[in-house]
Amino acid sequence: MSLYLLPNIRRVFKDSLTRIWFVDTDYSIEEEQLVMKFMDVPGDLSLISGTIFSELIIIVTIETSHTASDDESSYERALAAVRELLSPLMKNATVSPISRYPKRQRTTKIMYGPDLKRIPTNFSRDVMDLLQQQGITSVMRVEVGRCLTFDNRHELYDITMDMVLKEIKSKESQIIYMEGFENFTVNTEPIHYASDIIQVTGTEDYVCDMIMKKIGPDVPFAQQVAYLPNVSIPSTSVATALSFKLRAAMYFTKEMSSFHYAILQCQGNLGFISQQTDGLRMQRSILMENSPLASCLGAYVTNFAFNCRQDYKEMKKLYTSLMVQAATNIRAGSPTVGGFVRLICNNGGLKVKLYRPMLYECHLASSIGSNLKTADFRPGNILVALGQFYPSVLDDTHPFYYRDSAADYNKVVQALNGFYCTVTSPCVTSSLRDLGKKTVKQHLFALLKNGGANLYISCLPAALVYQLQRIPETEWLCSLEHLLDVYFFNTYANILFLTVKNTSEYTTLGQQFKPIEILQNVARLFKCDVHILGETVDKIGIHVINDLGNPYNYTSRRHYGQHCYSMFKPPENPQDYTLPGASEEEEELECVVLTPGLDWAQGFVIEECIRNTLLSPTVGSKAFVVQHIDRCGNGLVVQQPGVGRFDFPLADYSLVLHSLVKPPMGDTPDSLAMWKSLSLEDLLNINNAEVHENIPASCMAVGEQPLKVAASPSNGALRAIAELLTNLMLGPKMLLSNLIVTASVTWESGQSCEELKAMLRACRAFAEQLGVNFVVSSASSSVPQDSRHLNTGIPRPSKFFKNIVCSGTCKVTSVKRALPVLQKAGNILVHVSIDPTEGLAGTVFENIYGLSLGTVSEISAPKMAALFAIIQDGVQEGVIVSGHDVSDGGLVACVAELCLSTEFVVRMTVPEGLHALGYLFAESPGVVVEISPNQLPALRDKCSAAGLFCQDIAYITNGDESFFSVVSNGKIVFQQPLSSLRATWSTYSDGLLSALCSDLEEDERHKGDYGCNEVDFRGLKEGLMNNYVAFYYNPDIQNKVAVLTWPGMTKDESLFWAFTNAQFDTYMVCITEINSPSFFNDFRGLAIGNGVGYTEPLVAAVGALTALIHTQGDSPALRALLHFFNRADTFSLGCGEFGFFILSQFIYYLHEQSFLVGHQHEEFKLSPISLEKTKSGIYESRWLSVHIPETTGSIMLAPCRGMVLPCWVQGTYLGLSYKTDGVESELYNENLVACSFHGKSSSSENFARHYPRNPSGNSSVAGICSDDGRHLATLIDPSLSFFPFQWQHLPSGYERMQTSPWSLLFYQMHMWCCS
């Protein structure tokens, strides 16, 4: 069939069959909100309880061939495979071709989901990818919609129906399906439907072009303002730093792990992000081979309500945007270790409006230095695109059906990392991308460096070539140029472009191949798409060649085809644009500025002001974000946002190691021979504290002050840099000359961006005075390019959003630092500041109350540098034992947050002569530090010499009831118990959890039962406390461990680090390289981690296993794994939701095999053990307690028998479920339960029964083992807590722990292998 989707553009669709299934399911969060609001209530909309049902609608489209006899068996097999793959979503419910709930009088049935005329969703891409791993290629699209059925007490009118639809469906991303699904068209190809076609006009970003690009003969303005005396610059907008990196051994290269000099780079971006992996791809184009270390994430939104009190829809809009970006970081293997959420009250004189949430992201990565070298760019290079071509949908909103595929991005990463491990000399000649949000055509022009290329039509994406081959040219009804522009060149697509040499090069195995052949072979291993688009030529421009009759082959000396047309890069001359109907000169609204005097303050009650400040979303807890993102998954994170026993997100900075393995320093003191006779007692007498001395790390932080930038752009920007410094100063010792400040800006376009340029010049001058490095990595316009985001019903604000966000990274060689957790009664709190009386302009206080309180003053760079140096010295000398920077909310918020993690009595006093409101809520750069009283005179002397304010403001004491109070002029103006203070500060976050998560009513009273984990080390406490058990890199080649990955996964580096630190010879092995049943004969251990890139990790795990099962006749992988598990000298570990599910299936299979007599053999199949989602229904990142029973059969857990230990637990499916009754009882009876989630107390009987200590709220089982104890599958990941500095919190009495008990698991297995 054919269809016209656009005027003059015809489409051809393949013959297909579509099946619809209905499956009972739980309410979605939106449906749950509807039920809670309107069930059995008076009014026109009154849902009758007992009649409200929710179903999933599974829509499967399969390609049909011309022979009907072959179709029946093939598509029935395909449908069965889809059902098996989606079984985690169906939860064993009955599948029906029609809804199980028929319509009656007053019954309403609403069927909704993704628009089937648009391109397939990300979920569909994942499912088809997983099916293709089973050899099933006939499935063209799989989508999941929803059906809500209910009876209403009254007849539903259109206006009432609109109320329902507003509650449950997304206006932009979801449509209503007609009953019977009659006459509907399913688009199965990545070719846009009409509404998603990008119009060429209005896609340029004027601000980006003016700041980041070369205009005429001048170098880009970003390069003009860069101040980089101490770092190298591989491009105009990127600063780097030097370190070292361990390259993990890939088994197919036959090389061991190796150490290399490494380059570190931080890439930031601020703007309306619609392609979640775009920032990662930009960084990948700079460092083609890199390992992600950490990310930061932030969000802005404006609000008209007092103190930004949001309704449900506003909350959902902000946090779904933020969390889908965080989820991409999770799937791409980059922990999110810092950030912010700022809601700006759009009242008073501010008048700023963001039409949708604006996001900030930055990514820190390391790359082997030699891989930065490129070969000469010249004619004859091969033009390559990596990744699956899928054009982006720019207006994607919740539920973000069209989010970028992290799995596809990971395949590109796997292919590139494998390629660079294989080649021995530079082979890539260009990998440049255009800056900002740009189309395929713009990226190609950037890649070609003002050169040229022949691009062949036969090499374009297969879906587009299919259309061109099946529609005669005479029937195209439009020019070829227009067609290719619409469907390829003018799309936003997340593919990575590069050019490579076309000459033979040597591999690490000494073989000679052309680089493109090496890349193709490695990409085939990781199922990564490689498109050879053409070749570079002398002639400037992109020259389109029609070679459909005789397709291009890069190996041929001569190519045939007809030159159709050429495209040329437009001149670099950015054109400003204005909004429709907007006048050229904007009318400035009158802004009443109050004088700096404090007469206005008479009507304010301090107690109420403090409470409103703590209730502010900008100041209050961000636990809803922090505890639902990956914050430590690569094993390198030393400091993430959560601090103290309650895991409160209060850390000012983050700390990330560059490597967890230390290269050998000459003759190592340990010998591999010792493992043969080593006992656990001997192990705990080893004390190698020097192993991790001076190991390199990066300290990261973010600074941003949009309210101050709005009041005074240049001075406000300097405050953002100052906040960055105050965030960092309590971290490990660092030199300002090593600090790289990476700025990202967004601005209203106009007036040649002179105001923005002046601000950036001020930043450069400030950086030069401070002696820090400064670079601009991105610039964007805050005016939405798509007019659909402009609400014409609301008058345009006087100004669009203007802001700068600065991320800072600094290399350090120590982890000694201070945290915002009070340490000791008898100590005092001291306020050190540049100027505590500077006023309230641009503060949170001013914004809450809609005031205009003066202007933002200049800031002294010498004072800022002195403040940084004094605080840094105090931390390193041990004088400062805790501290917190003064920032959002002012001094009172800073001191209150210092109190939250403790049970002390803290009485704060406003110094004489200072006005309480002006002093408590000012946000002058400064810090509050905890010191001993006898250290105060020395600190005062240092501050006085530097011209800094230094005043003791609070005393820390013990008391019967802990509380925080503020005294001014001898009177208590605020006093609140700490339990109440914590509740106030957490109000906004708790409200988000209730509003945006699944039904938590059952566990509502337990949601505060988190943290304060008691531990029990049993008889090993003394050895673990006193001795630092660690080893240099010295792999035992007799004992190899394979860390098993799949295409689309991230590197499971935490497991790699852990086994390598236990001196195993560790290799990364992809499932696709297993080519023989004897593949694992040289391996003693096998590990499977949790780095899955697919949106639904449990579906991915089922897909990985079913691919092994259904291809076992053709693939040796399953036979190799079964052979490995059945050997008596092997062990395995599966961690996290993915690793647990894979390994648990083999453990249960081995258990069942043990009951068979003689030589009977049961076919491997999925076991009755499965996983269920967390109680919240979303990703969890928690520091939870686990109990290892005395009777555990696990060999690996043997050193920790009887212990209660805290550990990191991260994932979406963190609870066991069973397809048949009695399975859990069987696990307990057969002693297969290896560990379980535990409560707060260390009592062995205190099993965790409720969320969040038990993430699913059901089964408390956290791990199982095989009958013989050799194989262990856990939902926890012990490798994330291998060293004490990886622990979220060390409980009282264990602060000086030298060796983590979790490391004993890995040492134990090395001893076992040698026994």
Curated annotation (Swiss-Prot):
Its main location: virion. The keyword Nuclease does not apply. Keywords: Virion, Virion tegument. It is found in: Virion tegument. SUPFAM superfamilies: Class I glutamine amidotransferase-like, PurM C-terminal domain-like, PurM N-terminal domain-like. GO terms for molecular function: phosphoribosylformylglycinamidine synthase activity. The keyword Metal-binding does not apply. This is Probable membrane antigen 75. GO terms for cellular component: host cell; viral tegument. One of its GO terms (biological process) is purine nucleotide biosynthetic process. InterPro entries: Class_I_gatase-like, Herpes_virus_tegument, PurM-like_C_dom, PurM-like_C_sf, PurM-like_N_sf, Tegument_herpes_virus_N. Coiled coil: none annotated.
